[in-house]
Structure formats: C-alpha cells, structure tokens
Curated annotation (Swiss-Prot):
Molecular function terms, GO-annotated: glutathione transferase activity; JUN kinase binding; protein serine/threonine kinase inhibitor activity
Keywords: Acetylation, Cytoplasm, Lipid metabolism, Mitochondrion, Nucleus, Phosphoprotein, Transferase
GST C-terminal domain sequence ranges: 83-204
InterPro entries: Glutathione-S-Trfase_C-like, Glutathione-S-Trfase_C_sf, Glutathione_S-Trfase_N, GST_C, GST_pi, GST_superfamily, Thioredoxin-like_sf
Oligomer status and interactors: Homodimer. Interacts with CDK5.
Family the UniProt entry places it in: Belongs to the GST superfamily. Pi family.
Modified residues (N6-acetyllysine): K128
Tissues in which the protein is found: Ubiquitously expressed.
GO biological process: animal organ regeneration; cellular response to cell-matrix adhesion; cellular response to epidermal growth factor stimulus; cellular response to glucocorticoid stimulus; cellular response to insulin stimulus; cellular response to lipopolysaccharide; common myeloid progenitor cell proliferation; glutathione derivative biosynthetic process
Superkingdom of origin organism: Eukaryota
Residues where N6-succinyllysine is found: K103, K116
Enzyme class name: transferase
Name assigned to this protein: Glutathione S-transferase P 1
Amino acid sequence: MPPYTIVYFPVRGRCEAMRMLLADQGQSWKEEVVTIDTWMQGLLKPTCLYGQLPKFEDGDLTLYQSNAILRHLGRSLGLYGKNQREAAQMDMVNDGVEDLRGKYVTLIYTNYENGKNDYVKALPGHLKPFETLLSQNQGGKAFIVGDQISFADYNLLDLLLIHQVLAPGCLDNFPLLSAYVARLSARPKIKAFLSSPEHVNRPINGNGKQ
C-alpha cells in the first residue's frame, strides 16, 4: 500500500507539482479521484477542513492546502535546502509561484475570454523575477535555489509548463527560464511522468480551459 494518497479532481490543477515531486523522487502514491458530480452532491465538502481539495494523506497524517503539502514533502524527502538561508529563499520562490498561480486561476475560472490578452501582455513582468533569481544562482545553470532540487523547483516547473500551454513562446525572452524548463523536464523520472498517459490525458483545469 503506497504511503501517500492524493484525493483530488481528475485534473492537474494544484496537484501536478506534488505528483512530479513524488515521481522524480521515486515515491509511489495512490490517487482517489473525486468527480465533479460527486463533489456537487455536497457530502464530501463538509468533511474537508477548508471545504476544498486537494486532500493528502501520508500514513495517518492528513493535510490540506497544496503548498503545505509541498512543504511537508520537502521536509520529509530532503527537498528543503541545506540550511535556513536556502529554506527561506525557497519559501520566497514558492510564495511567488503562488502569487502568479492565483492570477492564472482567476483568469481561467472568471475571465478567460475577455482577460486572456491582457494577462499574456502582463506575463513578462510576472516571469522576470524568476529569471532574475535563476541568474543569481550559479548563472542560471542549476536550480532556482542552491545546487539541489527542491519542492519549489517542482512548483515553479509546473507553473511554467502550464503557462507555455496558455501562451506558447512566453519564455522566448527568458533564456534562463527556458533552459531551466528543458533541463528539469529532461530529468529521467520527470520526463517519464510528463509523457505518461496519466499526465497527458489529465486536463490542466476543470472547466475546459487549457
């Protein structure tokens, strides 16, 4: 029985980063898929701490909130930096990822048709901080922080991949980010995950946008 269970909708959404992390680290996990119809029946929602998914189980530990789950896996699997300085920088990166993901989710679920063009125009300004951070770490040839992969890398990689679907070419003016995505996506276990039917056949969002 896998030690980890992901309870979530049949989409990539807020779980694909943790799935990539688990796959890359050679961990097995179980998926409990909650259909929209099941969720709309209203019986599961009151049992969830914040009334939302994902729900994550690590043995007898149950967690909610996707970033809390990522940080837990980071601590558990040695993906949280070598010291407090690196850990603090990883937290900063991850919060930056969450800021942009929040903007993306708002676009997808509330204003896709009318807001996409303005969103894409503003996107370079939101991507630039990550390019800057890469440039400050080993010339952008390694990870976002330090010399070992971290939970923040998986979250950033997922964010960049979904934006490449939304706006192909969005990284063309960011050579370090472009190389970073290619480099991480080529890690054998991530490459296998990204080409797996489970990933390929899972839509990014739950409303047919992307």
